[in-house]
C-alpha cells in the first residue's frame, strides 16, 4: 500500500454477532494480498476468565485503557484491525450506570470518544449483523432457538 496514512478498522456489534470471525477473516485476506496489518483481539476476553464480566462504568473505563494500550502498540505499516470497538465501552458504561458516581466514568468515557474522533483513530467501523438476521451454522456460543 503506497500511502503514508494507516487505515485502522474496528468491528462493532452485539454479543455473538461474528465480530471476531469477521475481523480475523479481513485480517487474513488483507495479509494474503500483501498488506501489513495487526490483528488486535478483544482484551476483555483474556481478563474475563479471571475476573468475570465487566459491568460497572469504572470497569468499562479500565477495559478501555487495556484495549487502547494494545491498539497503540500496533506497528503494522497499513494499520490494525480489531474486534473490540472502544466506543462500545462508553455505550455499555452508560447502560450499566446505576449510582450517581457512575456518571464520572461515563463522562470521562464520552470525552475519550471525542478524542478518538479528533485523532481520527478509526477510519472504518464495520458493524457485524445480528446473528438472527443472517443464516449460519450454530456453535457452542449460540443458543439453538
Per-region residue spans from a language model:
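A glycine- and Lys/Arg-enriched "phosphate-lid" helix/loop adjacent to the NTP-binding pocket
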Residues: 96-145
Amino acid at each position: 500500500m503506497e500511502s503514508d496514512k494507516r487505515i485502522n478498522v474496528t468491528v462493532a456489534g452485539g454479543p455473538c454477532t461474528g465480530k471476531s470471525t469477521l475481523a480475523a477473516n479481513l485480517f487474513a485476506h488483507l495479509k494474503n494480498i500483501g498488506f501489513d496489518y495487526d490483528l488486535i483481539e478483544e482484551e476483555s476476553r483474556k481478563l474475563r476468565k479471571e475476573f468475570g464480566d465487566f459491568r460497572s462504568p469504572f470497569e468499562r473505563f479500565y477495559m478501555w485503557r487495556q484495549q487502547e494500550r494494545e491498539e497503540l502498540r500496533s506497528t503494522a505499516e497499513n494499520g490494525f484491525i480489531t474486534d473490540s470497538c472502544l466506543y462500545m465501552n462508553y455505550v455499555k458504561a452508560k447502560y450499566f450506570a446505576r449510582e450517581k458516581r457512575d456518571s464520572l466514568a461515563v463522562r470521562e468515557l464520552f470525552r475519550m470518544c471525542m478524542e478518538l474522533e479528533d485523532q481520527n483513530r478509526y477510519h472504518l467501523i464495520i458493524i457485524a449483523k445480528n446473528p438472527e438476521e443472517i443464516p449460519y451454522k450454530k456453535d457452542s456460543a449460540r443458543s439453538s432457538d
